[in-house]
Amino acid sequence: MLEFNATESRSQPSRRDFLNLAIASSLGTIAPIWDSHEARAAGSAAVPLKLGLVTYQWGKDLSLVDLLDVCKRTHYAGVELRSTHRHGIEPSMNAAQRSEAKKRFADSPVALVGLGSACEYHAVSPSVVEKNIDETKAFIDLSAELGGSGVKVRPNGLPSEVPVEKTLEQIGKSLQIVGRYAAKANQQIRLEVHGKGTQEIPNMKRIMEVADHPNVVVCWNCNPTDLIGPGFDANFDALAPWLGTVHIHDLRPGKVDYPWPALFKKLKASEAKGFTGWCLMEDGATPPDIPAAMLENHSVFESLSS
């Protein structure tokens, strides 16, 4: 069990957070309440796949105005705004800045898919975990205010001095707290498959089993580790019930060695209730002509998703 020495408030986690969550779960009172047009309802048709951009690295140097313009011109329907980039969308924004950003998205055909935080919950120190939970809540509030539908978070490693299972449970219980908070704001918590050790599929599955909240979903990250052990199909299927969003990489031939046709076959058949359909371009290699690369990827995406 995590130990927090915080007073109870809307932004502070406590032991009672865990207790109340356990009670609510046992009574069946927790339900997904994010926008129904982005989540799959039981028995509905497959969710259409949509191409968006993560500002890492292709959009990190663009202002919000330029970012929306480039996405519009290259037919990217949405954007996940990674924290600390030039767009300036941060929890520290004042009311006027938030109002302006909200209007920018309202006036654009490009949707705010959500915010990409670096919040993580694996630290040995409870105070550090608590700080990350508080930061996550601030990102949730901002995403909801600006019209987004979720916040990306991540696991980021397994401290060597702590048993692996204990760290996985700590991450999962922290996700329960932020997932419960996100539900009140119609937001998802999107856990990126990330981090040394934590990105291994059995560990991610364990984290999600502990989290056990409908507003906590997986952001499939298209990692090389997806292909180890039992292979892509089995690894994807292990996390498929929790699928929410996808971070894809450069789809052009010869760029990234990944089974893209197999992935898109899985995505088109997804029955995950939290799957939004968003496939978000995130690639660490910066092409010399980013808009041209985006257009070329859009063409490949259309072929793979049809």
Placement of each model-derived feature along the sequence:
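Short acidic/polar active-site loop segments enriched in Thr and Asp
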Residues: 77, 111, 149, 276-277
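Active-site acidic/histidine proton-transfer and metal-coordination neighborhood
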Residues: 17, 22-32, 43-45, 68, ...
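Glycine-rich, proline-tolerant flexible connector loops at the mouths of alpha/beta enzymes
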Residues: 82-102, 156-162
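Histidine-acidic metal/acid-base catalytic patches
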Residues: 2-52, 61-75, 198-306
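Conserved beta-strand positions in the central sheet of alpha/beta enzyme cores
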Residues: 80, 114-116, 152, 247, ...
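Catalytic domains of carbohydrate-active enzymes, especially glycoside hydrolases
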Residues: 67-84, 147
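Active-site-proximal loop/turn and secondary-structure-junction residues that shape catalytic pockets
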Residues: 57-59, 83-85, 119-121, 155-159, ...
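Short amphipathic alpha-helices and their capping/turn segments at secondary-structure boundaries
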Residues: 65-72, 95-107, 137-145, 233-237, ...
